Design a protein with these regions (language model features):
Chain A
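Sequence signature of WD/YWTD-type beta-propeller architectures
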Residues: 2-355
Length: 355, 471
């Protein structure tokens, strides 16, 4: 080639040295990052092993499941974390009977129990399980995503809500899948999103509708939430399993829960100022006869749970602890909002009242 | 001259030095020197492309590990509902698309794609530090948004870097190799995250630490190992120095000889939006838009499969891993195929595979066979379209506007696909899932031949300067 090759080669040499230096720097960086990550991972693994095998610090008693009780998911750290457990209805903060069943959400009527769980592994799957009074499995079916709500009706119907989540940048958001099964595992409804949605008598079909939070009225009717962000509504709907319809009742009602006497619905009311990106949910009660809403702002924290009625005058719901988020407490609040909330069952989640 | 060569070290030197062999209009026969070596080099994917693939691999391990467990983290560890998380996700879809064009534009204007990409990768890496300390949903939401902005910024300059480093003849294969590595990271990340949660039930922080480590290594690999390619400057050098080397007058009927040095420091031909007026570019964007409008999200295919049979429900969380695995395996071969048969042709006919996936999801045969076939077709669809689109675009437009053009083509596709998903959702509820899928498959089977006609006869293959006539 020509004479100007020489300076070019000189430049090449210098560039070559720079490349070697950069490669060495990258090798050092790799070593540092790997060593740091592995060290942290191993120490966390040891800590987790120690915590998991440590006995849970809870008072344990027998025979609670034979009397009226509240069944829940125990969130006391230690070897019993995540197990379904029960406390006596007349001594909520007292000792608990712990079962061998592990659940994310649990709902029970005393003879039948529904347990939604995450089967962790390299392949994480989710399932719903129905158990009989002796805690034997009678039916299971797969869930498409993270278990969120479970409700069992006295008529042998099971409503489950799972979050089907986006997994990649290209996917659009999330969706819920809410279905109703019979306790023997047969599918009654399919995805409730496929029911005909009637808003003020008109059939509407917003693309982004999601259905969740079923509460049963009887063997055929239920209440639930239907949300469509594009339409800007979060409706309370009354569903009909035979007609396969969802009829809107009221806007702004989320995650309803029917009172034992069937006259009121407890729900999450979004008290965040209009236009804010995130919701702030406050418990509220709707009188079904007058459609009058009482917002229970004695509870100032953000409550994200499907509320349960302890009795006709008291609500129960779970809240994570600020300082130890894996541990939750079940709180109680008078349904008329006249007194502040207090801890009903410490270290518990997903309460279900069995009378 | 040495200073100029140093500005484009390593692989960047390759195109310049090999330019006499690769420049098409060369009237003389090829220099007889080392023809075998040259051919072998042309068949190989440049190390810069592989390094960029490794950068993407690490970054995808980092981001997908977090993305996969974020809903669980928000619900299980923070005690919030995923409904709240959905809000976050919806907010950022549009913003990400616009940032893509901007990232390409800045990289073209500055002629520094590496550093624009580094800003994007760095931004995402910073959000991993944030995750270690974030506790509330607003904090996590803003981190997710920042991460997506980072992804938007880096994509177009990164693809411009690949285009600059690759041999124009095997551009498709280079993009394919990059996408294979990228997708491997996207598949590995979630598996890694779930493996950690399996071993450490509350191992969120461990996942975030691993994610941070992978992101830091990704940025480190980019900054330390990828040469600072200056595509515009290199193109200028290629055009001018080679003519000089060949003893030709520096320019043929142009005036660029006079301001030589000034033009060099400015980085060659300046950026101009006029590429958007070029007939071929418009045609490409039109085809990408039309096909994008018929590409409904994979989410719908998965949901349809899951509605139909229990097999898909049980493995629902894994369906996308299957798709990604196929995509990963086929990306490089599909890119090679595109180089041979024509990139536009492969891009267009790849959408027939998507129609096949819809048919599998709509067909009344439930069970593992149709589910697996649908996943294979989806993966093959991505392999024949994603990297190929970038390869096609970067070969079609002048070097000076490559980043912007790639960003624009990707944005057109992304926005069209978003619209498709919204529209398909309406159809899904109006006609039921089976009919909706048949309609989408039918529309695709009409659109594909039409688009194939639009791009017939190599209409979207590059004009002379970028492609070897003998290829």
């Amino acid at each position: 080639m020509s004479a100007d090759d020489a300076p070019a080669r000189l430049g090449d040499d210098r560039a070559q040295r720079s490349v070697v230096r950069r490669r060495a720097a990258f090798a050092v960086l790799t070593l540092v990052v790997l060593a740091g990550t592995v060290w942290y991972g191993v120490s966390e693994l040891q800590r987790a092993r120690a915590e998991q095998s440590a006995p849970s610090q809870v008072d344990v008693a027998d025979g609670i499941l034979d009397a009226p009780h509240v069944l829940f998911r125990s969130t006391a750290p230690g070897d019993l974390y995540g197990h379904a457990a029960a406390v006596a209805l007349d001594d909520l903060s007292g000792p608990r009977e712990v079962t061998s069943v592990v659940c994310d959400r649990v709902s029970s009527d005393g003879t039948t129990t529904v347990c939604l769980r995450t089967d962790r592994g390299v392949v994480t799957t989710y399932e719903a399980e129905v158990l009989d009074a002796a805690w034997r499995t009678t039916a299971t079916w797969p869930l498409p995503g993270i278990p969120s709500r479970a409700r069992l009706s006295p008529d042998g119907l099971v409503a489950t809500t799972a979050f089907v989540t986006g997994h990649s940048y290209s996917q659009t958001g999330f969706s819920t899948e809410t279905t109703v099964h019979r306790v023997d595992g047969t599918d009654v409804s399919g995805n409730l999103e496929d029911f005909t949605l009637l808003a003020d008598g008109e059939r509407v079909a917003p693309v982004d509708r999601n259905v969740w939070g079923v509460t049963f009225v009887d063997a055929r009717h239920f209440y639930a939430t239907v949300q469509s962000r594009s339409l800007g509504h979060t409706w309370l709907v009354r569903g009909d399993l035979e007609e396969r319809t969802l009829v809107t009742v009221l806007d702004g009602v989320e995650c309803p829960s029917l009172s034992p006497d069937g006259t009121r619905l407890a729900f999450k009311h979004d008290a965040a100022p209009a236009g804010s990106a995130t919701a702030h949910w406050t418990p509220a009660v709707l009188d079904l006869a007058s459609l009058e809403v009482t917002v229970l702002d004695a509870e100032e924290r953000n409550v994200d749970d499907q509320i349960t009625w302890l009795d006709d005058a008291t609500l129960l719901y779970g809240l994570a602890r600020d300082d130890e988020p894996e541990t939750t407490d079940v709180w109680s609040l008078p349904a008329d909002g006249t007194a502040p909330p207090e801890v009903a069952i410490p270290q518990a989640w997903s309460p279900s009242v069995v009378r | 001259m040495s200073g100029l060569v140093r500005a484009v070290p390593g692989d960047a030197g390759q195109p310049i030095r090999t330019a006499p062999e690769a420049t098409p209009q060369t009237p003389e026969p090829r220099p007889p020197r080392r023809p075998d070596a040259a051919r072998r080099r042309a068949g190989r994917v440049p190390s810069t492309v592989v390094t960029l693939g490794v950068v993407s691999f690490l970054t995808d391990v980092s981001s997908e590990a977090v993305t996969a467990i974020l809903p669980l983290y928000v619900t299980a560890a923070l005690g919030l509902s995923v409904v709240a998380y959905g809000v976050v996700d919806g907010l950022v879809q549009g913003a990400g698309a616009l940032v893509r064009v901007a990232g390409g534009w800045v990289s073209d204007r500055t002629d520094r794609p590496k550093w624009v990409a580094a800003v994007g990768y760095g931004l995402s890496a910073l959000t991993r530090v944030g995750l270690l300390f974030a506790t509330g949903l607003p904090a996590i939401a803003s981190l997710v948004v920042t991460d997506r902005v980072g992804k938007g910024v880096r994509t177009a300059p990164r693809d411009a870097l690949i285009a600059a480093a690759a041999n124009p003849r095997n551009l498709g294969r280079s993009f394919g190799v990059h996408r294979a590595l990228d997708t491997a990271g996207a598949a590995l990340g979630p598996l890694l995250a779930f493996a950690v949660l399996w071993a450490i039930p509350d191992g969120w922080t461990t996942i975030f630490v691993i994610s941070l480590g992978a992101a830091v290594l990704g940025v480190g690999a980019l900054v330390l190992l990828v040469p600072d390619l200056r595509p515009r400057q290199a193109a200028w050098l290629r055009a001018h120095r080679t003519r000089q080397d060949r003893g030709l007058p520096k320019c043929k009927g142009c005036t660029c000889d006079a301001p030589g040095a000034a033009a060099l420091t400015a980085g060659g031909r300046p950026f101009s939006w006029s590429f958007l007026r070029g007939g071929a570019t418009v045609r490409l964007l039109l085809v990408a838009g039309v096909l994008g409008l018929l590409t409904v999200g994979d989410g719908f295919v998965y949901l349809a499969l899951q509605d139909r049979d229990g097999f898909a429900t049980q493995w629902f969380p894994l369906l996308y891993v299957g798709t990604n695995a196929v995509y990963m395996l086929l990306a490089a071969p599909a890119g090679r195929l595109a180089d041979r048969l024509g990139r536009a042709r492969v891009l267009v006919w790849g959408h027939a595979l998507l129609a096949g996936a819809y048919v599998c999801a709509a067909a009344p045969f439930s069970g593992a066979a149709t589910t697996v076939t649908a996943l294979v077709l989806l993966g093959a669809f991505y392999a024949t379209t994603d990297g190929v689109l970038s390869a096609l675009t970067s070969a079609l437009v002048p070097t000076a506007v490559r980043g912007t053009a790639i960003g624009t083509a990707q944005t057109v596709t992304a926005v069209a696909r978003m619209a498709a998903s919204a529209g398909f959702g309406v159809l899904w509820y109006a006609t039921g899932r089976v009919d909706a899928l048949w309609i989408a498959a039918g529309a695709l089977l009409v659109a594909v031949p039409v688009c194939a006609y639009l791009v017939r006869g190599g209409r979207l293959e590059p004009a002379a300067p970028a492609e070897e006539t003998t290829a």
